[in-house]
C-alpha cells in the first residue's frame, strides 16, 4: 500500500488493546510494512465503566501505553482519534435496566432497532473534547503521525 494501513481499536470484543499479545499477533499478521494502530482514546475509555474524570481517563490510557511500551510496540501507534468518552454511568444504568426489563428484539421492526442501537452507541461513545490535566503529555508520549479530533455533533449548527 502507498498509505499507512491502520486498524482502530473498539470497545467490544476484538481489538480492544487490552491484550498486548493479541494485538501483536494481529499487526504482525498484516502483510504490509505500512501498518499500525489508530488509537481511539474514547473507545479505549469505553472498555471500563469506572472512569469519572478526564484525569482518570489519562491515567487509564497511560497504564495501557505502559504495557505497549514494555512490549516494544509503541511505534505501531501511528494515529490517534483524540476524544473523551466517559459513558460508564450510562452503561451501568442500562445494564441494570435491561436485566430488570429485558427487551424482545425480535418484536422490534428493523429500522426502529437500528435507531435504538445507534442511539445506544452514541450514549456510550460520547466523542467529547478531551481536555484535562495530562492530555497533552499523553499525546506527546504516544507521538502519533496522525491526529483526528473526533467529536459528535448534536446538530448541524
Role assignments for model-derived ranges:
Residues 13-17:
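Active-site-proximal segments of metal-dependent phosphoesterases and phosphodiesterases across multiple
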Residues 20-41, 45-157:
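Histidine-acidic metal/acid-base catalytic patches
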Residues 1-10:
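Glycine/proline-rich, flexible active-site/cofactor-binding loop segments
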Residues 10-12, 152:
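Short strand-loop junctions, especially beta-strand C-caps/beta-turns
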Amino acid at each position: 500500500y502507498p498509505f499507512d494501513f491502520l486498524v482502530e481499536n473498539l470497545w467490544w470484543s476484538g481489538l480492544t488493546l487490552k491484550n498486548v499479545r493479541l494485538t501483536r499477533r494481529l499487526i504482525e499478521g498484516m502483510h504490509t510494512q505500512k501498518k499500525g494502530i489508530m488509537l481511539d482514546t474514547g473507545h479505549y475509555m469505553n472498555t471500563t465503566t469506572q472512569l469519572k474524570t478526564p484525569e482518570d481517563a489519562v491515567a487509564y490510557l497511560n497504564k495501557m501505553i505502559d504495557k505497549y511500551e514494555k512490549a516494544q510496540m509503541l511505534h505501531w501507534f501511528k494515529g490517534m482519534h483524540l476524544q473523551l468518552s466517559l459513558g460508564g454511568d450510562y452503561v451501568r444504568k442500562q445494564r441494570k435496566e435491561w436485566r430488570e426489563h429485558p427487551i424482545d428484539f425480535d418484536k422490534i421492526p428493523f429500522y426502529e432497532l437500528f435507531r435504538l442501537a445507534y442511539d445506544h452507541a452514541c450514549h456510550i461513545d460520547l466523542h467529547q473534547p478531551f481536555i484535562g490535566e495530562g492530555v497533552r503529555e499523553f499525546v506527546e508520549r504516544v507521538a502519533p503521525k496522525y491526529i483526528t479530533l473526533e467529536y459528535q455533533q448534536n446538530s448541524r449548527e
